[in-house]
């Protein structure tokens, strides 16, 4: 019994829907019409969708052609604006589901054909309006029997052939649009203020020149957070041995410490306290330039301002000393006269 069932299944598959044309190695041109032919049996689907599939590219490109009545056994398609190349195949599948294939043709080639005459192009353009209704109605699979659909197939053959022209034209234009590329101007983005609420992964070991700050989200910022050996870093986390200034030496800190703002000449930063899990919860960090020349200039400026401040302080000190000295160096005669009159007045009283 099992053998009989397997044999019947083999016969059914052999008699199922199959495509006769195009055959292997056929060459179709893009300047006219080509005919697709197939065989069906009474158990096959009453309608099927025709798809043009290109296996020469990856992933394969599937293009919808039309939905046909399978009992007709043939369909004439307009190949105008079809893609050219090798490895093309016609598939008959369930409408709207190109992966549910009923039958496949052998692979064939498509080449560029000569330009069509003006009369054929004008007739093709004039049939676009009349083919709109027929193409929309043929998009759904037929539910009638094969006998009733065969009587109406001859009347709708011309409208289907004309609608394929408009569909292939629109598909060609959509393909052209999809291959266009848009050029974008490259620009470097460097914000002056770097606000953050929750940033993790900011531990850095042996960081040089401070190109990365706060892990993944701090690219191109000149700061070193929680670094054990940071050279030429502008910012650092409070640690056991942090040297004030531009360079941070042997800054070994934990995530429980907070960033402290040093004087301007020390190039430091103020943020809020970090949590134990290593997330900076609140704060705003100023992003400085990574240009060492700018930092050197700032250090020179700060050094100059410190020198000028010390000079002004020494000048002020010297002026105070000179004014005190001038008070001491007043003429002694005036003091003596005042003392004499005071003694005389006391004796008189």
Swiss-Prot record:
Sequence intervals crossing the membrane: 327-347
Spans annotated as Disordered: 115-190, 243-322
Compositional bias per record (Low complexity), positions renumbered to this chain: 116-176, 243-278, 289-322
Cytoplasmic side: 348-349
Residues spanning the signal sequence: 1-16
Subcellular location(s) of the protein: Endoplasmic reticulum membrane
Any Pfam family matching the protein: Kre9_KNH
Membrane topology designation: Single-pass membrane protein
GO cellular component, one term: external side of plasma membrane
Name of the protein described by the UniProt record: Uncharacterized protein C553.10
